[in-house]
């Protein structure tokens, strides 16, 4: 059973809020949106007080969300964004004007959502309770409404149809890409997964499709658009401007963001688009954290994401010795990821992360050997693994830590968390 919010304690601290969120169940007993709808009712429907763009897809959601918000912000709109997961702190999930909200604002938003959740749970029949992601999403919508944002760019968590974010009357929906992920919940085929994600499409909405979409996903998109009366916009692969974040995939993501911003706002100012492209920051995606050797963190966590990463590496490494630090969760296609990553690396160190679903490093090392790669070195502590990789690469080499967003989070965290990490 989820924890009840503390009573008679006045305003919560950020630590109070984080402890409460982490006490909640990850999944409800009933799969659906009923709890979330009741939360919105208890909070007086904050999600209806701003315009919205809904971002779904297998890869590229967070980057596209940030990029779309950056373009709209530079066109004079007061923007908000909701993202998941976070890297260092829950505050990163809720952004206003391209800045994370303050810890005090996060605490107040969660406190509002917690009291709404208590009302919903008390009125519920049976043991079903509001979940962690539902409270976070409710807190985000509450805070975005309280901050008077004009438009929020909202990243879905899992799928679309029954994702807690799917209570917004979005004007524009974005499908970035579709690959085989979360098949236990979304279905075994690309078409099944696309169908679940595309359930966010609104009647008369505008559906922006990422370039290179799988043909089965494209067919589903056309069918959904026809049924809902939505207009399809196909984003090009080239954004038409220089993009600051590293990676070929980020150029594609910015092209999608540009198409979405135009669908929402109308004709865009090229200079403002170029400024957004140059200035937007994307943590955890080919993020440079050190030089000599060049050290990069990237949260690619499935074969498609690793393929996009591998495509981008040659223009970044320039043939320099590259050492990878890898951790992968146990529900991912580790073999598919490693098979794509190994040819791009000269050496590999396998490690773990705080996420309890991280594969044991010996398992990863064995799998690397089975795939014909060089012997993988095992260093269980992520920070020690990164330092070992930097030594192996030498000052002129490249170090890449990837395979899990949770590995990236561990490496970016400035100090060990006193609370257990969220696995959402």
Task: Tell me the role of every PLM-derived stretch.
Residues 68, 161-171, 412-414:
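Short Gly/Thr/Asp-enriched flexible loops that form oxyanion-binding sites at enzyme active sites
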Residues 1-59, 63-78, 87-89, 208-209:
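N-terminal leader/targeting and accessory segments in enzymes
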Residues 9, 27, 33-48, 74-168, ...:
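ATP-dependent carboxylate-amine ligase catalytic core
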Residues 148-150, 319, 394-396:
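Short, high-confidence coil segments that cap the C-terminus of an alpha-helix
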Residues 404:
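Active-site-proximal loop/hinge segments that shape catalytic or ion-binding/gating pockets
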Residues 151-154, 163-174, 178-179, 192, ...:
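Nucleotide phosphate-binding/pyrophosphate-handling subdomain across enzymes
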Residues 120-124, 135, 147-155, 170-271:
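Acidic, Mg2+-coordinating active-site environments of NTP-dependent enzymes
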Residues 212-233, 262, 294-295, 338-398:
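C-terminal helical cap/extension that packs against the catalytic core
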């Amino acid at each position: 059973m989820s924890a009840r919010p503390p009573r008679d304690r006045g305003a919560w601290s950020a630590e109070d809020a984080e402890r409460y969120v982490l006490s909640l169940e990850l999944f409800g007993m009933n799969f659906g949106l009923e709890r979330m709808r009741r939360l919105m009712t208890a909070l007086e429907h904050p999600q209806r007080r701003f315009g919205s763009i809904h971002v779904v897809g297998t890869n590229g959601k967070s980057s596209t969300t940030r990029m779309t918000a950056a373009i709209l912000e530079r066109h004079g709109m007061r923007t908000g964004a909701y993202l998941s997961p976070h890297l260092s702190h829950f505050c990163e999930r809720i952004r206003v004007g391209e800045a994370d909200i303050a810890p005090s604002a996060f605490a107040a938003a969660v406190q509002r959502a917690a009291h709404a959740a208590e009302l919903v749970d008390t009125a519920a029949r049976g043991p079903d309770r509001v979940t962690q992601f539902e409270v976070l999403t409710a807190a985000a919508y509450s805070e975005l409404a309280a901050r008077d944002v004009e438009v929020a760019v909202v990243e879905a968590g899992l799928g679309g149809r029954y994702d807690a974010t799917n209570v917004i009357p979005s004007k524009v929906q974005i499908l970035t890409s579709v690959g085989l992920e979360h098949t236990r919940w979304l279905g075994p085929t690309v078409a099944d997964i696309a169908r679940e994600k595309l359930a966010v499409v609104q009647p008369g909405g505008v559906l922006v499709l990422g370039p290179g979409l799988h043909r089965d996903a494209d067919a589903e998109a056309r069918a959904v658009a026809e049924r809902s009366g939505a207009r399809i916009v196909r984003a090009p692969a080239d954004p038409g401007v220089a993009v600051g974040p590293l990676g070929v995939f980020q150029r594609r993501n910015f092209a999608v963001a540009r198409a979405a911003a135009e669908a929402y706002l109308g004709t865009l100012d090229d200079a403002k688009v170029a400024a957004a492209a140059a200035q937007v920051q994307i943590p955890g995606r080919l993020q440079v954290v050190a030089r000599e050797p060049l050290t990069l963190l990237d949260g690619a966590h499935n074969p498609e994401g690793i393929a996009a990463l591998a495509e981008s590496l040659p223009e970044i490494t320039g043939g320099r010795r590259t050492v990878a630090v890898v951790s992968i969760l146990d529900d991912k296609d580790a073999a598919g990821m490693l098979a794509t990553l190994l040819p791009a690396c000269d050496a590999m160190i396998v490690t773990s992360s705080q996420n309890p679903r991280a594969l044991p490093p010996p398992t990863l090392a064995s799998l690397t050997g089975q795939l014909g790669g060089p012997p993988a070195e095992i260093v269980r502590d992520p920070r020690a693994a990164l330092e070992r990789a930097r030594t192996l690469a030498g000052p002129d080499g490249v170090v890449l830590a990837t395979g899990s967003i949770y590995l990236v989070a561990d490496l970016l965290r400035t100090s060990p968390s006193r609370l257990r990490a969220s696995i959402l």
